Amino acid sequence: MKPVLIHTHFHKRKTGVTRSIENVLPFFTDDFETYVYGSNIDGNKITTSKLKSLLFSDRKTVVHCHRNNEIIRMLCYRFLGGKFTLIATRHAETIPSGLTKFLLNKADKVITLIKSMSNNLGIENTIVGHGVRVGEFVPNSEKKLEKISQENIILNAGRVRKEKGQLVLLEATKILKEHENWALVIVGQVDKPPFLEELKAIAKKYEIESQVYFINETRAIISYYQVAKIVIAPSFSEGFSLVTAEAMSCECSVIATKSVGVHSELITHDKNGYLFEAGNVLELETLLSKSIKNEIPLVGKEAREEIIKNWSAKKEAENLIKVYKS
């Protein structure tokens, strides 16, 4: 009988964490009887009664949590006599709060995503970076977007908020006024409506509002990667940056902030992407301008090669299985 693996997901919406869990689930089934427990996630869902029956049985069970509320629930079951291995992944690059550190110390094993996160945590951990479904996130030069008249697309995907660097992005894309067949498409959930209005005001100031599009968060993000020639990730902070890896898998030429999240591990500057200092408008503007004018090459093919070789969801799952079985 296979051991049991349960990934928990207690969140009101689908997020990058959700996608990272969904990416690896198919690769566990040869080794584990695999379930997800919670809501707003795709997978083989388990009921609370079935969960309890497993946790309080003699079946070898691994529970992998991703948020504090999930760890707390599992620790309650353990206090009541549940027998299982508790794995916790830290998804944020910031220094953990006292509560978070306390909860992580209660886990049997802790996973981090990138080197800086591992070094700053202060708790023994294993680094397992996220992976991409490389068979699904593929280039498609035939893909088109309705309602966008420009032929060439620059994409920014993810949450729309100050930490994600869209102010820097809008300032840098003022050069679009000189390139009427290029558009900036920003796809993601807006945290605060006034911030969106601030971005629109910048576009209006530079007279590029007809070349800047704001699209609500969508699960159909692959289509946007496939039409984009360039993807810009201008974040000041990232836990990982799955968007960047997904874009690279779709053969987008990526311009991303240096030493933020996994950017500097994914990207070798000038080889499979481009890096700039977070907040440096001029540096981003220069890289973008040179890319548009073909003064530096678009390196999407090299980007995909890097993801296939080192950052696939299958490879992530293999590394997680090593942790589960250790």
Residue ranges of predicted features:
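A charged, aromatic-enriched C-terminal amphipathic alpha-helix characteristic of glycosyltransferases
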Residues: 297-325
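A conserved mid-protein helix/loop that constitutes part of the nucleotide-sugar donor-binding site
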Residues: 16-23, 152, 161-180, 184, ...
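Short hydrophobic beta-strand element within catalytic cores of glycosyltransferases
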Residues: 253-257
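Acidic anion/phosphate-binding donor-loop and adjacent secondary structure
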Residues: 98-99, 119, 132-147
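Conserved acidic donor-binding segment of nucleotide-sugar-dependent glycosyltransferases
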Residues: 268-270, 274-281, 289-295
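Short His-centered aromatic/hydrophobic patch
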Residues: 65-70, 90-91
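Aromatic "clamp/platform" in nucleotide-sugar-dependent glycosyltransferases that forms part
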Residues: 217, 236
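Glycosyltransferase donor-sugar binding loop
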Residues: 38-41, 157, 183-197
